[in-house]
């Protein structure tokens, strides 16, 4: 019990808690005093009903804060431990009397009841800001973690403005009245671009009501009435362009601090090796700067990424709960692009589709609103069609029929097989699927948006047979594993009103919201265990734009993520942002560019799993493909392709190009 109490005491550090201003309990935490009073009245651990009744009555005049209510179980445990301490101290070393023994038994039973009790519903019922927020559609439709985001935001604004949480929520509702779009959402004032306006409104109201009593009815645990630093100074929100400039300067200074001593040491080493040659020292210094620049920048970024969480806490992405299923308004297609080379590859693709379907069964009995498709191509060939390929397509259709008969008999088909025919590519001199994976996804987006199926030689069963069009497209690789619940969370994030893309003044890039939401990618334990090499690279975080470390950093700092090819796409918004922006036969690695044009978010709390190469050669081929693709993004920094590329996107592209030479630079610096 003492260990539990000590752990709970740590939670007291995350915020200021009101204390009583006068009386016998002056200076004591209000929630702790009230919890002890309740335990004394009940003669032991109070039941959930007693807790609700007691604190409801108290809150008629003096509402508790969200933090106080969340700490009620901890305060009740603390109160019982104080009672236990009093019993032990008064008994001394002698035997316990009958009365004290009974009291001790009651306290121990009370501690056990507190451990076993479920306070979640009690905490929800007692939270007055939560009751008020329940009237907001965006709050009530959100999942529990997102609702906690709203409540935490209200508590932080309350601390910052010295207004009560009830006042913060009331003012957020007032600001949302009579508005349309995002600004009609209460969450916009609490979590998004409406927050500065809310803070200004609360401070203006505070000036008008100066001299009235604090809504909490309790003073803050400070010795004076002086305002804190965060209240004295207005918080200036930097633009992403300013953040990029500051980070670039900071990285340059860090790299210089690391590189200058190394260059000086190299110069002295050169003088020692070539004492007769006056240029030896200079050459050693120049070579050290050239080959040490990339390692120094890598180290600077590593330091920067390590320090950033200290200054800026990551903000999770809001999500809908989707308690009743996806619904037709959020109709989603899950697509797996594959290369069909044999009968085995067809069967593996069907098995992958079945696994994704089964992983989605946690939130909808018939998975209403979500469908699954194999997006297939044949390998490049000197011929438009080859012998045996028609049989592979027929096998795929048979397997799709089998899946539909097993999982959706009598209903509309949920599984589909789409296959593109080869077209001649004059640049490569072969027949191939247009633009490979990018072209396949682009064709599927057109099909899902307006029923255009002209690129597909096989569309079985017809994916456009329903009047309703798909709203979202989830793209996964053939070796991607989607855990149970991941699809629901992805769709919930994409469908949340605060994440829906908003285009202002006819722009092609969203000003608010996101066209793509990319999950966190991790290596599967099976692929990591295949070889020592796979185990070694499965945990790499490095400087590549597709790595977890870089994705976390970009999201925490710029509130934009990196798209690595897996994620959920808002179909209409993506087509508006990306269509016509990437010329054909120019880009091999297109995911980063698409994320830049369409504005991608990063859902760090939604994890999908991917396989890793088990040997050096496949890994090196993948790195070589990524390197070529990254270098092909260089033209997007200049006209005419840079339309829609902002400062953050330029930083991402330059970062990847810089990281592409990291391995060579590290090796050269090591040899030097």
Explain the meaning of each model-derived region.
Residues 24-69, 76-92:
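Active-site activation/catalytic loop segments of kinase-like enzymes and analogous catalytic loops
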Residues 1-45, 49, 472-474, 480-485:
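Active-site acidic catalytic loop and adjacent metal/ATP-binding pocket
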Residues 73-87, 234-304, 519-523, 563, ...:
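Alpha-helical bilayer-embedded segments of polytopic membrane proteins, i.e.
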Residues 1-8, 60, 87-102:
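ATP/Mg2+ or Mg2+-diphosphate-binding catalytic cores
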Residues 48-52, 297, 301-305, 488, ...:
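Short helix-terminus and kink motifs of transmembrane alpha helices
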Residues 302-319:
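Transmembrane-cytosolic junction motif
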Residues 4-15, 40, 44, 60, ...:
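Conserved helix-loop functional segments at active or binding sites
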Residues 96-238, 242, 315-643:
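Internal catalytic domains of large membrane-associated glycosyltransferases
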């Amino acid at each position: 019990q003492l260990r539990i109490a000590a752990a709970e005491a740590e939670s007291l550090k995350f915020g200021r808690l009101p204390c009583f201003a006068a009386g016998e309990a002056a200076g004591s935490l209000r929630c702790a005093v009230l919890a002890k009073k309740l335990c004394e009245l009940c003669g032991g651990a109070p039941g959930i009903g007693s807790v609700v009744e007691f604190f409801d009555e108290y809150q008629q005049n003096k509402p508790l804060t969200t933090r106080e209510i969340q700490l009620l179980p901890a305060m009740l445990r603390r109160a019982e431990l104080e009672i236990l301490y009093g019993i032990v101290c008064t008994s001394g070393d002698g035997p316990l009397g009958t009365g004290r023994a009974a009291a001790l038994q009651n306290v121990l039973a009370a501690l056990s009841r507190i451990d076993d009790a479920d306070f979640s519903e009690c905490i929800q019922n007692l939270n007055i800001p939560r009751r008020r927020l329940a009237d907001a559609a965006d709050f009530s439709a959100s999942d529990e973690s997102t609702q906690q985001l709203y409540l935490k935001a209200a508590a932080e604004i309350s601390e910052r403005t010295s207004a009560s949480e009830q006042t913060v929520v009331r003012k957020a509702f007032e600001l949302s009245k009579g508005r349309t779009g995002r600004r009609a959402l209460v969450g916009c004032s609490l979590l998004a671009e409406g927050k500065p306006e809310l803070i200004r409104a609360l401070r203006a109201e505070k000036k008008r009501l100066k001299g009235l009593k604090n809504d909490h009815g309790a003073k803050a645990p400070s010795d004076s009435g002086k305002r804190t630093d965060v209240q004295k100074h207005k918080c200036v929100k930097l633009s992403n362009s300013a953040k990029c400039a500051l980070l670039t300067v900071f990285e340059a200074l860090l790299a210089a601090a690391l590189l200058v001593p190394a260059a000086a040491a190299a110069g002295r080493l050169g003088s020692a090796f070539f004492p007769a040659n006056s240029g030896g020292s200079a050459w050693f210094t120049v070579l050290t700067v050239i080959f040490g620049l990339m390692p120094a920048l890598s180290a600077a970024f590593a330091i920067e990424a390590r320090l950033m969480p200290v200054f800026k806490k990551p903000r999770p992405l809001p999500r809908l709960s989707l308690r009743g299923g996806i619904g037709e308004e959020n109709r989603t297609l899950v697509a797996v692009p594959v290369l069909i080379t044999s009968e085995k590859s067809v069967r593996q693709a069907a098995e992958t589709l079945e696994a994704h379907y089964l992983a989605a069964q946690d939130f909808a009995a018939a998975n209403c609103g979500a469908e699954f498709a194999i997006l297939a191509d044949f390998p490049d060939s000197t011929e438009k069609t080859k012998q045996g390929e028609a049989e592979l397509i027929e096998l795929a259709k048979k397997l799709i029929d089998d899946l539909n008969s097993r999982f959706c008999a009598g209903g509309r088909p949920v599984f589909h097989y789409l296959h593109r025919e080869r077209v001649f590519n004059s640049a490569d001199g072969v027949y191939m699927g247009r633009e490979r994976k990018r072209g396949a996804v682009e064709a599927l987006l057109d099909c899902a948006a307006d029923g255009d199926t002209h690129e597909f030689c096989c569309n079985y069963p017809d994916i456009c047979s329903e009047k309703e069009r798909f709203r979202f497209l989830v793209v996964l690789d053939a070796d991607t594993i989607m855990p149970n619940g991941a699809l629901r969370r992805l769709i919930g994030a994409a469908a949340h009103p605060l994440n829906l893309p908003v285009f202002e003044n006819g722009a092609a890039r969203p000003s608010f919201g996101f066209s793509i939401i990319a999950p966190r990618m991790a290596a599967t334990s099976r692929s990591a265990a295949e070889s020592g090499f796979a185990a070694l690279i499965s945990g790499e975080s490095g400087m590549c734009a597709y790595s977890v470390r870089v994705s976390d950093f970009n999201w925490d700092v710029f509130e934009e993520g990196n798209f690595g090819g897996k994620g959920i796409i808002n179909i209409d918004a993506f087509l508006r942002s990306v269509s016509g922006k990437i010329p054909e036969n120019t880009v091999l690695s297109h995911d980063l560019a698409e994320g830049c044009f369409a504005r991608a978010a990063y859902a760090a709390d939604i994890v999908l799993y991917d396989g890793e190469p088990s040997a050096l050669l496949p890994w090196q081929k993948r790195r070589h493909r990524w390197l070529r693709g990254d270098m092909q993004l260089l033209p997007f920094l200049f006209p005419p392709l840079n339309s829609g590329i902002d400062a953050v996107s330029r930083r991402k592209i330059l970062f990847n190009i810089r990281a592409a030479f990291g391995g060579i630079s590290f090796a050269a610096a090591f040899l030097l």
